[in-house]
């Protein structure tokens, strides 16, 4: 730990430098506390994360952070100060900036009441942070609405959006067995559920679910049990229902981002460029091409709000914190492969049966023709 802190910009902060430490929340990675840290001649609100398994797997965590340190200068990544140690448990804790408006999931009811320009600006900040991660050849690996944070200083008109928990999932996943799955099901790409590695494209899939939340005001699949059945449905192409009155250009981008084939999804840079075009000329529509003008007018004319027919109450087995799932990717793949095999045989059987029927009908027709009595009097055939 000492060598790591010496080599990086991170700090070792003695625990007695914190005051007013209080429990804040429990997340997928561990327990979260809020505290006041007197630093640079002023009080700073910070978060202390008591990370599950961090002390037992410190080397893995530090190695991961050597790579992720390059993202700390991004204005869209929550700032990571360093480490401390709980004197009672002797466990290491991560010290990070505190976002005073909570996470995106807790702000969805407010987001849905925003106009499209505000929504697009928020999405632009989120995808900018994701792009900052990807251009360093890194992957978030646990991107969901609980890791998108809102902060607002008293003098700001709107919230600043940050991405958090970058690099915190690797130490947890090092404890998993070969076929274990860890995460939040609705935000996990099909290929990840099936046991493949995380890639930038799997982060983009997660971003598509956040895009959908901006149209619905609720988390994806909140009315379903987050179990193997939902995972199977996601792998077979099921996605959240498109919300009425969503601008078509937005729907098309969202669908590209959640494509079942990872190679068909756009990169974070491509998504960033598209959203930037939607935002930049918002107040000067006359000076842009017809297609972009049409798209922007869609956003301007779209009603604010969401479909009142959506179920806003969550299912009792809907879980939106990262967790070890109670089924494995091996089980998931076995069921999917079995279904594919059944569908193949069913298709073969159906086409074969159709051919048999057609051949049978042709045969019967020939028999009937051959059995018809032929008149010996040709006059019988004349009209």
How should each PLM-predicted stretch be described?
Residues 31-52:
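Glycine-rich ATP phosphate-binding loop
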Residues 79-92:
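Short beta-strand micro-motifs within the conserved protein kinase catalytic domain, predominantly
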Residues 122-123:
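Activation segment signature within eukaryotic-like protein kinase domains
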Residues 134-151:
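Catalytic-loop of the protein kinase fold
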Residues 241, 258-270:
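A conserved short helix/loop substructure at the end of the activation segment
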């Amino acid at each position: 730990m000492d060598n790591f802190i010496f080599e990086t910009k991170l700090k070792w902060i003695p625990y007695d430098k914190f005051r007013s430490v209080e429990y804040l929340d429990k997340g997928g990675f561990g327990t979260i506390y809020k505290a006041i840290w007197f630093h640079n001649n002023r009080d700073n609100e910070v978060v202390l994360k008591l990370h599950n398994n961090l002390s037992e797997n410190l080397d893995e965590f530090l190695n991961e952070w050597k790579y992720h340190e390059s993202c700390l200068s991004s204005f869209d990544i929550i700032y990571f100060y360093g480490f401390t140690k709980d004197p009672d448990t002797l466990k290491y804790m991560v010290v990070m900036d505190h976002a005073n408006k909570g996470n995106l999931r807790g702000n969805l009811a407010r987001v849905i009441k925003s106009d499209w320009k505000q929504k697009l600006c928020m999405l632009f900040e989120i995808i900018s942070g994701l792009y900052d991660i990807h251009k360093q050849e890194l992957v978030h690996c646990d991107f969901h609405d609980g890791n998108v944070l809102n902060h607002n200083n008293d003098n700001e008109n709107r919230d600043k959006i940050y991405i958090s928990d970058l690099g915190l999932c690797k130490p947890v996943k090092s404890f998993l067995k070969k076929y274990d799955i860890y995460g939040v099901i609705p935000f996990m790409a099909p290929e990840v559920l099936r046991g493949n590695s995380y890639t930038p494209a799997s982060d983009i899939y997660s971003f598509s679910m956040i895009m959908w939340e901006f149209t619905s005001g609720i988390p994806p699949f909140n009315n379903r049990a987050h179990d193997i059945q939902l995972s199977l449905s996601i792998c077979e192409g099921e996605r959240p229902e498109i919300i009425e009155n969503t601008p078509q250009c937005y729907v098309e981008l969202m669908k590209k981002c959640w494509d079942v084939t990872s190679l068909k999804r756009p990169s974070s840079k491509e998504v960033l460029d598209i959203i930037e075009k939607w935002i930049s000329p918002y107040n000067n529509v006359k000076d842009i091409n017809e297609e972009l003008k049409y798209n922007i007018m869609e956003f301007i004319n779209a009603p604010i709000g969401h479909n009142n027919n959506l179920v806003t109450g969550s299912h009792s087995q809907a879980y939106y914190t990262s967790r070890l799932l109670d089924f494995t990717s091996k089980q998931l793949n076995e069921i999917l492969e079995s279904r594919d095999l059944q569908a193949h045989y069913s298709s073969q059987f159906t086409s074969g049966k159709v051919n048999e029927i057609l051949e049978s009908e042709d045969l019967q027709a020939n028999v009937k023709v051959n059995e018809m009595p032929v008149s010996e009097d040709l006059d019988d055939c004349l009209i």
